[in-house]
Design a protein with these regions (language model features):
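Short secondary-structure transition/capping segments
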Residues: 11, 32-33, 81-83, 129-132, ...
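Short connector loops at helix/strand junctions that flank enzyme active sites
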Residues: 12-14, 38-40, 135-136
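Structured adenosyl-cofactor binding patch, chiefly the S-adenosyl-L-methionine
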Residues: 16-19, 60-64, 75-91, 151-190
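Active-site/ligand-binding-proximal alpha/beta "capping" segment
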Residues: 118-169
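Short, charged, surface-exposed secondary-structure boundary motifs
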Residues: 8, 105, 171-175
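RNA substrate-binding interface of SAM-dependent RNA methyltransferases
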Residues: 1-3, 17-20, 26-125
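Small-residue-rich anion-binding loops in enzyme active sites
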Residues: 1-11
Length: 190
């Protein structure tokens, strides 16, 4: 049976287990917002194509009560099998809102809904994360580990923030950075 299953799915089943699921229909970001409690806590991804990292970030979002994941046009789907596996299935509990133009969506979130759109920008000494007020509605924006946030998306954000770090370390894995940012929300809103 294992060989037959591997033939059907086209890849090696490490533990001989296969799951079948249905991808939920996409959620329109601006249709979703009126149904969410305030202050909003959102996460957006720009250019995040590593499915494993995306899956762990999804799991982190679920753990910290993020209300929706906004997936920019240059990011991978959080429903890729490796993303689903690394999310430990939490991707099916978190509303996922794909957008065709992340820059435009972020500008609209800020202008029309008062959401602070905060770019995770390693190396920024201007705004360190603990100094940023995240008690109100906010959307953290994370980019790919190699390229970071694209210039157009960075320009669309209302501010940037960096995690204070020592010893010449300039960045963290995106899911780890996400956990630090989201913990700061938990700390400030306590």
């Amino acid at each position: 049976p294992k060989r037959l299953m591997e033939t059907i799915v086209g890849f090696h089943l490490h533990q001989g287990i296969m799951a079948v699921g249905k991808i939920p229909p996409p959620v329109g970001l601006f249709d979703l917002l009126p149904r969410l409690a305030k202050p909003y806590l959102l996460v957006a991804v720009d250019g995040l194509t590593n499915a494993e990292n995306l899956g762990v970030l999804v799991r982190t979002c679920a753990a910290f009560g993020v209300q929706a994941l906004i997936v920019g046009e240059t990011s991978s789907s959080p429903y890729l099998r490796r993303a689903v596996r690394n999310s430990m299935g939490t991707v099916f509990t978190l509303p996922v809102a794909p957008v065709e133009n992340l820059s435009k969506a972020l500008r609209q979130l800020h202008a029309s809904y008062g959401v602070e759109t905060i770019a995770a920008q390693p190396g920024s000494t201007k705004n360190l994360l603990p100094q940023i007020n995240v008690r109100g509605a906010c959307c953290f924006v994370f980019g790919s580990e190699g390229e970071g946030i694209s210039p157009s998306v960075l320009e669309a954000c209302s501010e940037t923030a960096a995690i204070p770090m020592h010893n010449g370390v300039d960045s963290l894995n995106v899911a780890v950075a996400g956990a630090v940012f989201l913990y700061e929300v938990r700390r400030q809103r306590a």
